[in-house]
Amino acid sequence: MDFLLLGLCLYWLLRRPSGVVLCLLGACFQMLPAAPSGCPQLCRCEGRLLYCEALNLTEAPHNLSGLLGLSLRYNSLSELRAGQFTGLMQLTWLYLDHNHICSVQGDAFQKLRRVKELTLSSNQITQLPNTTFRPMPNLRSVDLSYNKLQALAPDLFHGLRKLTTLHMRANAIQFVPVRIFQDCRSLKFLDIGYNQLKSLARNSFAGLFKLTELHLEHNDLVKVNFAHFPRLISLHSLCLRRNKVAIVVSSLDWVWNLEKMDLSGNEIEYMEPHVFETVPHLQSLQLDSNRLTYIEPRILNSWKSLTSITLAGNLWDCGRNVCALASWLNNFQGRYDGNLQCASPEYAQGEDVLDAVYAFHLCEDGAEPTSGHLLSAVTNRSDLGPPASSATTLADGGEGQHDGTFEPATVALPGGEHAENAVQIHKVVTGTMALIFSFLIVVLVLYVSWKCFPASLRQLRQCFVTQRRKQKQKQTMHQMAAMSAQEYYVDYKPNHIEGALVIINEYGSCTCHQQPARECEV
């Protein structure tokens, strides 16, 4: 538009006297964008872009005009005063992150109408006036993350119809005002993660028809109601990781195009049976590290488009209600973490869910959960309230509110006696199989040795034969020695003659009388 006016001005001046032409021509040239003045000391200039970074500046440089971009990152700015950037009417982006800014006046960005990108992250801002962004209607991206914002002014984002990206991560925000984003019709990315949100109002996100990604992770939310996200028809990704959510419900029956949902790291114990019927296009779901004990068959039926799911780290009850989940996992063609462990009952603690179903014959009187039979083994719950216990009593032949996929049936769950018998049988079978396996290994080793090392086996056999022969020789010698000793004592006959014995020496002779021997009883 400026160039069109300039052309008309020149055309009109060419038809006037020369003096008038020169005067008016000078006035017209003042309408042109001013060239940037000299580059401030220690700053870096690249054409009409100025970078004054990490210089410990406490104020913005003065006498700057004609700039298209200004970066004052990593300095020591503490306050943004009214009219501080008045001369930068051509500015399109402004970086003020990593300073010590704690106060922003309402008219600090006056006359910065052309700014499209504003970064105020990593400062100490505690509040922003309602009129902070009013002078910048062309904003596309605003970064307020890593500050100390505790509350948001109700009209803070009023008039920002071109805003597409908004970062408010890692503040201390406790509440999102109703319809605060009403004018942000072009917003596609919104991050309010790592704050202190305890609840959400029903119309907090009203007007965000083009929003595709919403981050609410690491807050203090205790309940998720899908009615809090009305008419977010373009939303594809919702992150609610690491909150304190215990219940997931949906009080509005409407369909949205959500494809990815992260609910991991919460305290979820109950989900309404129809809660996922409002997201028929859901492809990725994270439910790991919660307190789920079972999943309703109606919920499993609504997971028709899933290609990825995580369920580990929950308190799975491997009892009456595990059959539907086991069958669904058997038939699931996508990716899942595969580390689902039983938390109860006691005899199944620590076992993999699918292994427990097979080992303890939990479903259909011991039948294995295959080919979708298990999904019809559990009756759909008719009530929508939280379960009184993880093992809900099923009525024989009763009819619940269901969508026609599951048929009512009874599930045989082993009692205490049957469970103990099953455990004992399982141990006996396991021990027998281990023994047979060990025997087969020994036979295999002998067979391989006989085939591969025949000479060694012959030597080993000769050693055994020689050793046995030596043992026999020793036994024979011992027997012969014992027999000779017995014959010596049995055949002994004394040759002495009863009477006097005369011993003669050089001094004379002695006479002694030998008495016959007597046997004494001992």
Curated annotation (Swiss-Prot):
Gene Ontology annotations for the cellular component aspect, listed alphabetically: axon; endoplasmic reticulum; extracellular matrix; extracellular space; GABA-ergic synapse; growth cone; postsynaptic specialization membrane
Transmembrane segments: 428-448
Organism: Homo sapiens
Region (Disordered): 382-401
Family: Belongs to the LRRTM family.
Pfam annotation, one family: LRR_8
Protein name: Leucine-rich repeat transmembrane neuronal protein 1
Gene label: LRRTM1
Tissues expressed in: Predominantly expressed in forebrain regions including thalamus and cerebral cortex.
All copies of domain LRRNT, residue ranges: 35-63
